Amino acid sequence: MDRFVWTSGLLEINETLVIQQRGVRIYDGEEKIKFDPGTLLLSTHRLIWRDQKNHECCMAIPLSQIVFIEEQAAGIGKSAKIVVHLHPAASNKEPGPFQSSKNSYIKLSFKEHGQIEFYRRLSEEMTQRRWENMPVPQSLQTNRGPQPGRIRAVGIVGIERKLEEKRKETDKNISEAFEDLSKLMVKAKEMVELSKSIANKIKDKQGDITEDETIRFKSYLLSMGIANPVTRETYGSGTQYHMQLAKQLAGILQAPLEERGGIMSLTEVYCLVNRARGMELLSPEDLVNACKMLEALKLPLRLRVFDSGVMVIELQSHKEEEMVASALETVSEKGSLTSEEFAKLMGMSVLLAKERLLLAEKMGHLCRDDSVEGLRFYPNLFMTQS
């Protein structure tokens, strides 16, 4: 922790923000520091940590101070962490929250997930080393040369040597396991290509395959599920997660919506999506939050809430006038219909059928007879006959 220096949190000249994540707690080695969880920012030059409550409390560490990083999986009651191993602090270091530390590493604990994406972006920055290619303000530079009177260099070299030996041993042990995984990935690639060809054939469908074959192929594709579902572990628990989830929902729901007349209840969507996601189940709250972003992201779907509170997902091209006209035509042909009868005729859920009839009633095209036998809708002759 003695490598951190106080900072304003503002980006320096030629410094670019890469990614940020809320709910990150810092450990000095294995010890939890006094600060509450805050926001961790990764730039091209620094790791910056800012207190979520007191924004004036902000500290940073140059990426040039990092030796290497490693992941630490989550456990029972423990969050996933990124372990950051550091060079010794420079003698001319600017003031920071800690004057000295016995540890040569820190841990970043991700309370609100997002560690997978953050680790990936941090690894990229450590590989590209962009801070060396761009002019860096003097305040960001750290003297990594040997300091007079310091004898810790030998200890650091020894630790690095042991870590390197341990890494080689680990690589040797897991190489055989990855051989099987590589074979599986090759097969997975073939399966993806096969699924794409099947999907294209279904889409074109110019008499090459029968209706029964189409249904069977679609069931195969559905059972295969989503290849790479959006998760909190990848994108965190904030707006970024819900935005990515909304984009994925738009991709997997457009075809089912077109088959169902352009509208589905949120309950149907929830079941369909979770079936496709397999083990990565989605909570109702996350589904609703993602659906609320569909229209703002200019995606082909939108969330609609009826007066009764029923939520549905519909295509942007889905027109209310056409829906009401279809309901009026069907009721006029039969003379009168209940929600159950209308649902059976239209091939939709009773919930959506009732909402469609209520909407037609609200617009004055239908009227109701609410009796002990149930709710029945009739064409509104008061509007059509004088």
From Swiss-Prot:
Component of the ESCRT-II complex (endosomal sorting complex required for transport II), which is required for multivesicular body (MVB) formation and sorting of endosomal cargo proteins into MVBs. The MVB pathway mediates delivery of transmembrane proteins into the lumen of the lysosome for degradation. The ESCRT-II complex is probably involved in the recruitment of the ESCRT-III complex. Its ability to bind ubiquitin probably plays a role in endosomal sorting of ubiquitinated cargo proteins by ESCRT complexes. One of its GO terms (cellular component) is endosome. Keywords: Coiled coil, Cytoplasm, Endosome, Lipid-binding, Membrane, Nucleus, Protein transport, Transcription, Transcription regulation, Transport. Residues 105-138 form the GLUE C-terminal domain. This is Vacuolar protein-sorting-associated protein 36. Component of a complex at least composed of ELL, SNF8/EAP30, VPS25/EAP20 and VPS36/EAP45. Component of the endosomal sorting complex required for transport II (ESCRT-II), composed of SNF8, VPS36 and two copies of VPS25. Interacts with VPS25, SNF8, TSG101 and CHMP6. Interacts (via GLUE domain) with ubiquitin. Interacts with RILPL1 (via the C-terminal domain); which recruits ESCRT-II to the endosome membranes. Interacts with ECPAS. Residues 160-185 form a coiled coil. The GLUE domain (GRAM-like ubiquitin-binding in EAP45) mediates binding to ubiquitin and phosphoinosides. Pfam families: EAP30, Vps36_ESCRT-II. It is found in: Cytoplasm; Endosome; Late endosome; Membrane. One of its GO terms (molecular function) is ubiquitin binding. Residues 1-88 form the GLUE N-terminal domain. GO terms for biological process: protein transport to vacuole involved in ubiquitin-dependent protein catabolic process via the multivesicular body sorting pathway. The keyword tRNA-binding does not apply. It comes from the Eukaryota. PROSITE patterns: GLUE. Belongs to the VPS36 family. The gene is VPS36.
